[in-house]
């Protein structure tokens, strides 16, 4: 009975806040000297024909590509999304100030960037998780891109989540439905010379790992090798399933990063719904089995349990790390760094290692 009560509280927390609707995607006039973020979008959602730039939860039979320019308000606080309450106002809220549809070729060219740019050929792909609408995924990526201040191209792979707490099973099917389309996007980027970093959250982590596994089984090693790094944030993946996936997946050039929290309430609900013993996103870095998993599967496991949560479920802490992403990337790209578990004691805080750490995670 106590477990059912906890599950009820989690569900209430996940669904209690008012959700932003497609009206937040209305294109408005930019404010003077506004900071902007350009996001490339690849989605297999069905477009909402009645609302420009909006998408439904329907599963589409083809990919749609676009470029969306988002204005960040002057008073923006790191890790927050200043949602508009009515018509978007760039002075106080995130706002779309430009949008255009793209062909697949245009998408790939824009993703590669200018030859003389320091970010040439570098991109970050965000694969959202369960219970996300198109606008929520779009603005979350814009927030992370704005906070990180890295020049890499921001790319959203948006799969058709129901954006409903009760849509867990449907979302699982939609994530599986999206595997081929994510593989297509990765192939297009690879052919254009783009080396992406993939940040996949929650159920999106399952989608990302499954897609890389699929590419490996198809012999598409060139595409797999083009991935600069794979970061799994609060991955909603059963531990046994993750082991099985990685056993037939070509090893990436860098360790796969797992951002985990022992107190992730959403993953606790997921485990209950799926009947799973443990998920990768709730690994305990003090457990010897976690050490074994990290060393065997080429993982860097980061405990982010002390990073502030944005909505009380402790499932969204990854968004708070965007501000220190350049330092995180520097730490993980250290060529002498070994795999093993890392402990992040808060944003910009100290790093300790219960078993192996080859290099500092955060540049001090």
Model-found features: residue ranges?
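Sec-dependent signal peptide recognition
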Residues: 2-9
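Residue in the alpha/beta-hydrolase core beta-strand immediately N-terminal to the catalytic nucleophile
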Residues: 197, 201-202, 231
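Short substrate-entry loop that stabilizes the transition state in hydrolases
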Residues: 132-137
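C-terminal motif of bacterial Sec signal peptides marking the signal peptidase cleavage site
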Residues: 13-16
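The conserved beta1-alpha1 loop
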Residues: 125-129, 201
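Proline/glycine-enriched tight loop/beta-turn segments at coil->beta junctions
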Residues: 116-122
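Lipolytic serine-hydrolase domain surface
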Residues: 18, 22-101, 110-113, 138-142, ...
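Gly/Ala-rich beta-loop-alpha elbow adjacent to hydrolase catalytic centers
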Residues: 182, 200-204, 208
């Amino acid at each position: 009975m106590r477990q059912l009560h906890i599950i009820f509280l989690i569900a209430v927390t996940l669904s209690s806040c008012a959700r932003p609707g497609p009206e937040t995607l209305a294109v408005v006039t930019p404010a003077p000297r506004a900071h902007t973020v350009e996001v490339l979008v690849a989605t297999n959602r069905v477009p909402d024909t009645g609302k420009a730039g909006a998408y439904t939860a329907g599963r589409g039979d083809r990919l749609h590509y676009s470029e969306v320019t988002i204005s960040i308000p002057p008073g923006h606080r790191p890790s927050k999304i200043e949602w508009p309450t009515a018509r978007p106002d760039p002075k106080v809220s995130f706002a779309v100030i430009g949008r255009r549809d793209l062909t697949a070729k245009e998408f790939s060219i824009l993703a590669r960037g200018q030859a003389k740019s320091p970010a040439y050929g570098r991109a970050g792909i965000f694969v959202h998780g369960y219970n996300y609408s198109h606008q929520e995924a779009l603005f979350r990526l814009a927030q992370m891109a704005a906070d990180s201040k890295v020049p890499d191209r921001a790319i959203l792979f948006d799969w058709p989540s129901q954006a409903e707490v009760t849509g867990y099973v449907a979302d699982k099917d939609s994530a599986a439905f999206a595997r081929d389309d994510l593989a297509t996007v990765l192939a297009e980027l690879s052919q254009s010379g783009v080396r992406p970093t993939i940040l996949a959250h929650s159920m999106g982590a399952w989608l990302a790992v499954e897609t890389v596994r699929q590419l490996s089984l198809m012999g598409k090693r060139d595409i797999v090798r083009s991935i600069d790094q794979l970061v799994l944030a609060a991955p909603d993946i059963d531990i046994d399933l993750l082991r099985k996936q990685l056993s037939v997946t070509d090893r990436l050039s860098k360790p796969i990063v797992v951002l985990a929290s022992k107190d992730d309430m959403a993953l606790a609900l997921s485990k209950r719904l799926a009947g799973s013993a443990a998920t990768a996103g709730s690994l305990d870095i003090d457990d010897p089995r976690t050490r074994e998993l990290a060393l065997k599967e080429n993982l860097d496991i980061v405990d982010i349990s002390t990073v502030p949560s944005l909505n009380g479920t402790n499932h969204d802490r990854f968004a708070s790390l965007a501000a220190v992403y350049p330092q995180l990337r520097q730490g993980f790209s250290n060529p002498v760094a070994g795999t093993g578990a890392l402990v992040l004691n808060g944003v910009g805080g100290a790093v300790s290692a219960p078993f192996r750490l080859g290099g500092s995670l955060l540049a001090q």
